[in-house]
Amino acid sequence: MTEFWLISAPGEKTCQQTWEKLHAATTKNNNLAVSSKFNIPDLKVGTLDVLVGLSDELAKLDAFVEGVVKKVAQYMADVLEDSKDKVQENLLASGVDLVTYITRFQWDMAKYPIKQSLKNISEIIAKGVTQIDNDLKSRASAYNNLKGNLQNLERKNAGSLLTRSLAEIVKKDDFVLDSEYLVTLLVVVPKLNHNDWIKQYETLAEMVVPRSSNVLSEDQDSYLCNVTLFRKAVDDFRHKARENKFIVRDFQYNEEEMKADKEEMTRLSTDKKKQFGPLVRWLKVNFSEAFIAWIHIKALRVFVESVLRYGLPVNFQAMLLQPNKKSVKKLREVLHELYKHLDSSAAAIIDAPMDIPGLNLSQQEYYPYVYYKIDCNLLEFK
C-alpha cells in the first residue's frame, strides 16, 4: 500500500516521548503500520494572522502541485508506451524511489532556505512548479503533434486494401503511364469473387485491354488487381465493377508525391526518436523536482496546522505512518484513543463529518491530531 499518513501530535515532556508512544501503539506492539519520524526543521513562525491565511493558500497549492506531479507521471507513461514497471523505474525523487524519499525525508535547505518566511518558501515552490506545468504543456504539445502526424501516416499504410495507402505496394511497371488514351486502374477484388473477376473484367465495359489484369498484392480478404482500359470507358467500368462487388480505388501513380510521403514519414520517425531521449530525461528530472516540492508542501502544512492547533512555543512531533492495508480501521481507532484528549469536539466520534471553521480540511478528514494523506499511486493505467 503506497499510502502514507503524515500526522503530528504535541510534544509530551519531550517530542521523543510522543514518538515512542506512537511507535509502540502502531508498530512495535502490533503490525498496524510502519512508522517513522518525519523531520521538519525550525521554520519561521510569523504571526497568527499570516498562519491562518497561509493554511488556506497551502491547501490550494498542495492540490495544484499534486496535480502537476500526476500529470508528469502520466505523461511519462504515455511517452514510454510501456509496462507499469518500466514507468515506475523512472519515477524517482532525488535518485531514490518515492517510498524511500518520503520515509527518509530531509528538508532541502539549499532550495528552500529556512531563514525565509513560510510565505516566501511557499511562493518559491509555487513559482517552480508553475514553470514545470507550463513547460510540460509546451513540450507535450510539440511531441504529441509529431507523434500524431506519424501515426496518421502509419495508419495510411496499415489496414485493409480497401482503405490503406497503396503507394508502398505498387511499382511503376504495374501501370501504363503517359498515354493519351489508356489508363490503369487498381481494383480490390474479394477473394471469394476472384474467379468471377477473371471471367468478367474484360467485359465489364467496352475497350478493356485483354489480359491486362494481374494480382499485385493481397490481404486476408481481398486481392489488389490492376486493369488497363481506355480513359473514356472508366466511368462505365467503375459502375459495373461496383455492381459485381469489385471496388475501384482512387489512385494515380505519382512518383514525386510517393517519394515526398516516404521522406515525410522518415523525417517524422527520425524527429520522434531524436526528441524521445531528451523528453524522457526532462520528465524524470522534473517529476523529481515536482514530487520533492509536493512533500515540502506537506511538511509546511503540518508545521502551520500544528502551530495553529497546539499553540506556541513550537512543540510537536511529526510522524509518518504507512498503514497495513488490512488494519486501516484499527489504526484509526488506535490513533483516536491516543489523541482524543487533544480535542473534546472530536473525542466522541471517529471519521464523522464535521465542519471546523478556519481549518482547511475536508469534512471527512478532521481528527484530533493533524493529519494529511500522501498517496503515491500516481498513475492511472487504462
Swiss-Prot record:
Tissue spec. comment: Ubiquitous. Abundant in brain, liver, kidney and testis.
CDD domains hit by this protein: V-ATPase_C
Source species, domain of life: Eukaryota
Chief location bin: membrane
The keyword Transport is assigned to this record: yes
Modification type N-acetylthreonine: residues: 2
InterPro entries: ATPase_V1-cplx_csu, Vac_ATP_synth_c_sf
GO cellular component terms, semicolon-separated: apical part of cell; ATPase complex; clathrin-coated vesicle membrane; extrinsic component of synaptic vesicle membrane; plasma membrane; proton-transporting V-type ATPase complex; proton-transporting V-type ATPase, V1 domain; vacuolar proton-transporting V-type ATPase, V1 domain
GO BP: synaptic vesicle lumen acidification
Protein's membrane topology: Peripheral membrane protein
Keyword Ribonucleoprotein: no
Keywords, sorted A to Z: Acetylation, Cytoplasmic vesicle, Hydrogen ion transport, Ion transport, Membrane, Synapse, Transport
GO molecular function annotation: proton-transporting ATPase activity, rotational mechanism
Subcellular locations according to the entry: Cytoplasmic vesicle, Secretory vesicle, Synaptic vesicle membrane; Cytoplasmic vesicle, Clathrin-coated vesicle membrane
Function: Subunit of the V1 complex of vacuolar(H+)-ATPase (V-ATPase), a multisubunit enzyme composed of a peripheral complex (V1) that hydrolyzes ATP and a membrane integral complex (V0) that translocates protons. V-ATPase is responsible for acidifying and maintaining the pH of intracellular compartments and in some cell types, is targeted to the plasma membrane, where it is responsible for acidifying the extracellular environment. Subunit C is necessary for the assembly of the catalytic sector of the enzyme and is likely to have a specific function in its catalytic activity.
Oligomeric and partner information: V-ATPase is a heteromultimeric enzyme made up of two complexes: the ATP-hydrolytic V1 complex and the proton translocation V0 complex. The V1 complex consists of three catalytic AB heterodimers that form a heterohexamer, three peripheral stalks each consisting of EG heterodimers, one central rotor including subunits D and F, and the regulatory subunits C and H. The proton translocation complex V0 consists of the proton transport subunit a, a ring of proteolipid subunits c9c'', rotary subunit d, subunits e and f, and the accessory subunits ATP6AP1/Ac45 and ATP6AP2/PRR.
Protein's name according to its UniProt entry: V-type proton ATPase subunit C 1
Species: Mus musculus
Gene name as annotated: Atp6v1c1
